[in-house]
Amino acid sequence: LERIPMLKSFTVFNIEQTDGLNLDDEISPQPVIGFDPLPDVEALFQRTGAKINERGQQAFYQPLTDEIWLPERHLFTDAANFYATGLHELVHWTGAKSRLDRQKGGKFGSESYAFEELIAELGCAFLMVDLGVSGEVQHESYIASWLKSLKDDKRYIFQAASAASKAHRFLMEG
């Protein structure tokens, strides 16, 4: 059996830009997952004064506006993963010039970007332990870069851990 690849095109419309459709029968709402807030993490978010927006479907820190963007809580499988993601982005937030002034600016996939991600992952892990959060650490896409850097520079992990520790201390001690 021989396979022949074919290219098909489809016309796609953004449902929010259409009029006159009755979608109540077509789209069923997503089931709401129970969300148990973690008061210690919520208090940390408030205490930092970080501007945290819960919209969209991606998590990131936006240096230009000094804002953290998180997907809405109901999009996470559980509260712990929401908070782990928020803590990761909060560590990025500490790197702003007005705070700990960590160098950033690398593009996705660059060594400097991967280094900042390692700082954020380690800092997040430190915070999760202190705050009693048990969630998943997201680092699969950076492992190759980290391994290469670890082979090239034996101090790499210590430099990242030091920066993560400073971020942890900055956040926990206010």
Where are these regions (language model features)?
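N-terminal accessory/interface modules of nucleic-acid-binding and processing proteins
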Residues: L1-G174
